[in-house]
Regions:
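RNA pseudouridine synthases
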Residues: 1-168
Length: 168
């Protein structure tokens, strides 16, 4: 190699995915060679799990790539609950997954939520309560002061109509 040469490294996917591709419409907000950004609708799980083997974001993304004959392993960086709608970040290969996962761990990627809540919520506040897996569930989480991981949520009320509040 000499100065100015360009080296391109291709790391092939190591195995076929266990997830079945499924033709599901995707709202792709952005895509480049490293990432895929999708607006995930509510009532759609991110990936297959107990009682939700089909109609997941992973099924749809695998269809999107398999229909283009592009090998792909599903690597979701910012997961959302099944009933939550919003922007989801996916890595397109092992290197971007590693970089983005590290950025998540170091809190360099910020997530922000909007929620409609019953009643009139305080104008702002902070919830500092440790979260742990709920008993008998692999998905649900609950406040657990003995075993929970640190979780801090800052919120502000954006609007209220006296019955419900829009909270950020």
């Amino acid at each position: 190699l000499v100065l100015g040469d360009r080296v391109e490294v291709c790391i092939p996917e190591s195995k076929e995915p266990d997830i079945e591709p499924e033709n599901i419409p995707l709202d792709i907000l952005y895509e480049d060679e490293d990432i895929l950004v999708i607006d995930k609708p509510s009532n759609m799980p991110i990936h297959p799990s107990i009682n939700h083997y089909e109609h997941t974001l992973a099924n749809g993304v695998l269809w999107y790539y398999s229909s283009q004959n592009i090998p792909y392993t599903f690597r979701c960086i910012t997961r959302l609950d099944r009933d939550t709608t919003g922007v989801t970040l996916l890595a397109k290969h092992m290197l971007s997954a590693s970089v983005l996962s590290k950025a998540m761990q170091q809190k360099q990627i910020q997530k922000e939520y909007l929620a409609l809540c019953d009643g009139i919520i305080s104008e702002s506040g902070t919830i500092n309560a440790p979260i742990y897996r709920a008993a008998d569930s692999v998905i649900e989480r609950c406040v657990d002061f003995e075993k929970g991981d640190s979780a801090i949520t800052h919120f502000s009320r954006e609007q209220t109509n006296g019955r419900i509040s829009l909270v950020r």
